[in-house]
Amino acid sequence: MAIDTSLPKDIRILQAAEEVFSQHGYEKATLDEIIALADVGKGTVYKYFGNKEHLFYKLVADKNVPFLEKLHQAVNSVDSFEDKLKKYFEVMVHFYVANSTLWQIICFEMLGGTNGCRVEPDGDDFKVIPRYNSVKVSEETSERILRYHKILHDEYNILSQLIEQAMHDNLLKHDTVPEITTKFVFFGVAMSIFNQSDDIAADMTDEEAARIITDHFLRGNAR
């Protein structure tokens, strides 16, 4: 991949970062490779982004903002619960296929699983706790994990609100637990895309994928 050297340096760095992170993941990606691809000096990267983690966060956060806007616009463009689900999943499938590797990095490298941590609700907020007694979570690690958790939470919270409203409108079973149901569906779709994104992109439109996901959620596979 060649980067247009007429672009502003920060844009070149972000484009190079997306290429390198997508090829190597977070841990194995190096700033040196990003710097070489962007054709900038090392000091320029530190000037704009500080370090590798801040650069990766800037990259995915900048993608997340318009994604959230599209999700909100999609669900607000129709009236029925079923149509809102279809629109939500159309946008989600399109985005996750296009950004599969970067969002896999968020889920598998940045959320603390490899550090023996997990995120739990803490009142109206969230907290990071160790999975094992031997794990000590530093403040820096906790802050990093929560930054990436917020990205995913903001995405699936839109779906959660749809499910909660559907329960209020007596459209779902009364024993439905919104948080569990939301995560089950959201991360089930995400993991399917992570493992089969090429097949989904080649063989199925976003609309068809969304129709199948919505139909299975509302009706299951029963005859």
Residue ranges and their predicted role:
Residues Q104-I106, H174-D175, S197:
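Short, hydrophobic secondary-structure boundary micro-motifs
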Residues H94, N157-D169, K183-R223:
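C-terminal peripheral helix-coil segments that are non-catalytic and often amphipathic
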Residues M1-H24, K28-V40, H54:
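Basic, helix-initiating cap at the start of DNA-binding domains
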Residues G116-D169, E179-K183:
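Amphipathic alpha-helical packing segments from all-alpha helical-bundle domains
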